[in-house]
From Swiss-Prot:
Composition skew (Acidic residues), residue ranges: 261-273
Protein name in the entry: DNA replication complex GINS protein psf2
CDD domains: GINS_A_psf2, GINS_B_Psf2
Keyword DNA repair appears in the UniProt entry: no
Function in brief: The GINS complex plays an essential role in the initiation of DNA replication. Has a role in chromosome segregation.
Localization in the cell: Nucleus
A cellular component annotation (GO) from this entry: GINS complex
A GO BP annotation: chromosome segregation
Assembly with partners or alone: Component of the GINS complex which is a heterotetramer of div-26/sld5, drc-1/psf1, drc-2/psf2 and drc-3/psf3.
Basic and acidic residues compositional bias, start-end: 244-257
Similarity comment: Belongs to the GINS2/PSF2 family.
Keyword Methyltransferase: no
């Protein structure tokens, strides 16, 4: 009998989904458009850059038909800036995700706005028909993101998976020696892992304690899902036990009050004291 699968995505599944992220390539030879499930790919015409899914870019790189342009956030200066921010400027929180992308609406060409649910609905229906809150601002993974367009100083949702894939299969395309980039990524992973473990201390308070995961990547969530789920479940059980004990003590105190003072006075009167 097969064992039940754990809830959530596994690390291999997260890495597979990350291969759908877009990256920038510089083609070495001409290639016509390819029909994919997500639409047609752009025609490749050297030396013009184009954006392709990561899996296709890695395939062309393996065939020596294109070079991959590393995203801006993978530059050593950007990684060093993120590490400094997470260790010196704000050691308690994770670095914020990239700002929501801007896109012009079909109904208002020439104007670019930050994407939110109302603007997303405008691509398929009029903005007046949208039932979403126009003031709500979402971020990846709840908005379409693009690793290739993520600015320096911010980590996209699939930053760890994309970085590992590019360093493994396109290390010669890195803006610096692959060893330097890998060392910075290792330091960043260790800093964020330690921060993830230490941030769980906020759950020790049973009141309004909460754990914020803003800025945490997909692979980090997959790696720590079992730990966090077990921790939350343990805190919930401890809190339920403490609440049950408190209610029992209150019930005993109330019963003691009912049988206490008035009963003693009545017994004294009966004895003529």
């Amino acid at each position: 009998m097969a064992l039940p699968l754990p809830p959530g995505l596994t690390q291999n599944e997260v890495a597979f989904l990350a291969e759908m992220e877009m990256v920038t390539v510089v083609p070495r030879q001409r290639l016509d458009s390819i029909d994919l499930l997500g639409g047609k790919t752009p025609q490749l015409r050297p030396p013009h850059r184009a954006q392709l899914p990561l899996w296709l870019a890695l395939l062309l790189k393996k065939q020596r038909r294109a070079n991959i342009v590393p995203p801006a956030w993978m530059h050593p200066a950007s990684l060093a800036e993120i590490i400094h921010r997470e260790t010196k400027e704000d050691p308690e929180a994770f670095s914020p995700p990239p700002p929501p992308p801007s896109r012009a609406l079909y109904s208002q060409p020439g104007t670019a706005r930050r994407l939110n649910p109302s603007y997303l609905d405008d691509f398929t229906q009029t903005q007046q028909d949208s039932q979403q809150d126009p003031n709500s601002i979402l971020s990846p993974p709840f908005l379409p993101s693009n690793v290739a367009e993520s600015p320096a100083g911010y980590l996209p949702y699939h930053w760890l998976e994309v970085a590992e894939a590019l360093l493994t299969h396109a290390g010669d395309d890195m803006p610096a020696p692959a060893g330097e980039v890998r060392s910075l990524l290792r330091d960043l992973v260790e800093v964020r892992a330690a921060k993830m473990r230490s941030s769980t201390s906020a759950l020790e308070g049973f009141g309004d304690a909460y754990l914020t995961l803003r800025g945490v990547g997909a692979m980090e969530l997959a790696e720590n899902r079992a730990f966090l789920a077990g921790l939350v479940d343990g805190v919930r059980k401890i809190g339920a036990s403490a609440e049950a004990t408190r209610r029992e003590e209150e019930e005993e105190a109330r019963r003691g009050g009912d049988y206490g003072g008035d009963g003693d006075e009545d017994s004294d009167e009966d004895m003529g004291l």
